[in-house]
């Protein structure tokens, strides 16, 4: 189980990313449309003044049950070993073990 402080930090990052999403997207569109370099620098400075944690690249997918940041399956929102345990216990409908 991940520390609660790390899970809380990740939730805080998600809120910041949602808050600044439109601002970041609009400023990136402006940068691509503006021809002069000096105006691009001004817009880039505005983009840089937004909080660091508002960038979507700083987000991690975490396991829904344990908060583990690695080996996550997007379809289930679970880490690999929790997914395996739940499939063995028949807790995930439609998921089957492969055998050949």
Curated annotation (Swiss-Prot):
Main function: Binds 16S rRNA, required for the assembly of 30S particles.
Subunit (UniProt): Part of the 30S ribosomal subunit.
The organism of origin for this protein: Gossypium hirsutum
Compartment annotation: Plastid, Chloroplast
Alphabetical list of Pfam families matching this protein: Ribosomal_S14
Name of the protein in question: Small ribosomal subunit protein uS14c
One GO CC term, this protein: chloroplast
Family: Belongs to the universal ribosomal protein uS14 family.
Gene name of the record: rps14
Keyword Endoplasmic reticulum: no
Gene3D superfamilies: 1.10.287.1480
Annotated GO MF terms: rRNA binding; structural constituent of ribosome
Transmembrane portions of the chain: none
One BP annotation, GO: translation
First-listed, main subcellular location of the protein, grouped into a coarse class: plastid
Entry keyword annotation includes Chloroplast: yes
Keywords: Chloroplast, Plastid, Ribonucleoprotein, Ribosomal protein, RNA-binding, rRNA-binding
